[in-house]
Amino acid sequence: MGEARRDSSSSLQHKKPPWLKLDIPAVVPPAAEEPSFLQPLRRQAFLRSVSMPAEPARVPSPHQEPRRPVLQRQMSITQTIRRGTADWFGVSKDSDSTQKWQRKSIRHCSQRYGKLKPQVIRELDLPSQDNVSLTSTETPPPLYVGPCQLGMQKIVDPLARGRAFRLADDAADGPSAPHTPVTPGAASLCSFSSSRSGFNRLPRRRKRESVAKMSFRAAAALVKGRSVRDGTLRRAQRRSFTPASFLEEDTADFPDELDTSFFAREGVLHEELSTYPDEVFESPSEAALKDWERAPEQVDLTGGALDRSELERSHLMLPLERGWRKQKEGGAAAPQPKVRLRQEVVSTAGQRRGQRIAMPVRKLFAREKRPYGLGMVGRLTNRTYRKRIDSYVKRQIEDMDDHRPFFTYWLTFVHSLVTILAVCIYGVAPVGFSQHETVDSVLRNRGVYENVKYVQQENFWIGPSSEALIHLGAKFSPCMRQDPQVHSFIHAAREREKHSACCVRNDRSGCVQTSEEECSSTLAVWVKWPLHPSAPDLAGQKRRYGSVCHQDPRVCDEPSSEDPHEWPDDITKWPICTKSSAGNHTNHPHMDCVITGRPCCIGTKGRCEITSREYCDFMRGYFHEEATLCSQVHCMDDVCGLLPFLNPEVPDQFYRLWLSLFLHAGVLHCLVSVCFQMTVLRDLEKLAGWHRIAIIYLLSGVTGNLASAIFLPYRAEVGPAGSQFGILACLFVELFQSWQILARPWRAFFKLLAVVLFLFTFGLLPWIDNFAHISGFISGLFLSFAFLPYISFGKFDLYRKRCQIIVFQLVFLGLLAGLVVLFYFYPVRCEWCEFLTCIPFTDKFCEKYELDAQLH
């Protein structure tokens, strides 16, 4: 076969005419595949502009089969936990949540801590410092267009920086409208990476109004005499165009269209704003072009590169997109005017009627965000960013999204509800700053009326008394541990009761358990065992302690005194007799009399008296009808309330450390807390989220209450004082972390310090605990450094953050452990500590916190 083919070809060569010449072209290798980022540019829609004709449609290339996706190993549980923990602490390397947090932190900083540095305002495109742009932070690689595309040459635009460098009047007058292009605009790849572009994110709708805001608007409408529906309709009619949050959906629907750059002369901006058509932007007028052509110094700029140094010298670092100047086909290039260029990035999807005001609408209806370091306090103190901020920092700022302040709303609801219930159930104590005294004539245990006085500390917060607050769950050391002084006080009272006996009056008017000194030898008989003949036997011997009014081991059936469960000789260890076998006549004087006094727990220190019910009610005590001795009742259990102790002799209500955070001393106290929560706490929670703020709030409050319980053990303390100062510490930490981007950080620091010192001075009044303030502030500092992610200024700062999390967590745990050891194992008695929390301007201004200062 091969020989036959060679013979046929040689025969054809001989038959070829001499004038015939065959030129067979060589095989051209296939062209290299275009870069992936240039694939969309093959479509005609991206190469269109107003003054450039459309390219003829090309034959589509055959469809290629998609590649199979690369299989990836699923993360293990350990890796998932590790990555989630890193994201939560804000130290992840490739975490989108970290970037969102950091961008949001900058917004909060701009609102709370004053002005930013001027270069930051210019680079972030923040005329009002409430909208952070990242377009200027991303400079995509140069755009290369092959010579086969309409005669275009390679374009390298080194000044394509985005929107950040804008004219000064733009920052003053707000966002400028798109200008008419002098030269045809080109497709922009920067719009794909721009944070303002809709191609890079899913459409986001505006969140609904909060319930509190709608309720407040409804209440305002009712006060003004209008209906809520009318007000809603009037507000709805004011909007004649679609909000920006819904316009973003149009952008997301056309991912194959790029942004177009438009350039305009500065002088004709305001004249042509009203003449823009709805669908397209036209070129400048012919008269304007003729004026530019008359200038002799103008040169042909077609195809020339933009002079970056000249723009920088004239402070016109413009947000240039990838573009070029195209030379006219088939002739000499027409001279193009050398003008000042301005640019507004306009999405092609916005080329519809009504879209020319999309940017002002977007800023008008966008939900207000909290810049990092510039929150509510920053607006009050006029804080601003510094002029220059690194692009990495700006990227972190813009990625931050606000959180819903669920914890603030829940906490405010609980505080309000508990305060209302406490005031309704326990009433209101006398209002004032001193002590209130009540004197009345009351029948006591001796059978005669006596003038008695009841002393009560006034409450200027308009709320319950200190005894009622302790019963509700206030911070009170004797209810949380076995206080040494309270325990010794109760033990001494029981020793006195051990040597007491029943005092029976001679006129048979009654009997009461008293000591020998309190029983009259002429009007009564003190039935003391074993001197009295009614003494019973115990193990063959007379009992030495007793007698007890209306209680005798010989006549009690439940519990009975039988061997081997005989009642001991010590009467303070006798149980309560619930059933007696004998009637009214036992031939024992201490059993046949009418008892006129029973145990009554008075005050907050565990003091017990055997007295009448009338006196006990007057002293606001707890009367025990079933008992006959004070040793048979546990007054601290009555005073503390809540859950009973596991061991009646050992108080164990440690949960008061966090339970008291939800109580308030009165209505005014609750209003102050609500105002703080709806301003400072709500603002911080929108930045950090409910979980971080809840941890800092609760742990700071617990630490503050623990320190207060150590240094002021006998004072009933309620309210989130430590928690509030812990939240204030978050503001200091936020200020320290945003120190590099603030224009005047020292000014913001001294303003915050003045606020804290004022609140600390306010804590010198009664019912306000400065020990909780100090400890809560210190613990809040440690917790904020550990749990609040912040802006990182480089890789070293990221590693430092990880070490900082571990160190401050260990420091806080050490502080908490030290306070626990001091509270439970090494109690501290500090006599001068009360002057740090309340200055006694008068003798009755501050409540006396000593153990036996108030025996009522």
UniProtKB/Swiss-Prot annotation:
Membrane spanning stretches: 413-433, 657-677, 693-713, 716-736, 748-768, 774-794, 805-825
Residues with attached carbohydrate: 584
Residue numbers on the Cytoplasmic membrane side: 1-412, 678-692, 737-747, 795-804
Subcellular location: Endoplasmic reticulum membrane; Golgi apparatus membrane
InterPro entries, sorted: Inactive_Rhomboid (IPR051512), iRhom1_2_N (IPR022241), Peptidase_S54_rhomboid_dom (IPR022764), Rhomboid-like_sf (IPR035952)
Leader sequence residues: none
Main location: endoplasmic reticulum
Protein name (Swiss-Prot/TrEMBL): Inactive rhomboid protein 1
UniProt source species: Bos taurus (Bovine)
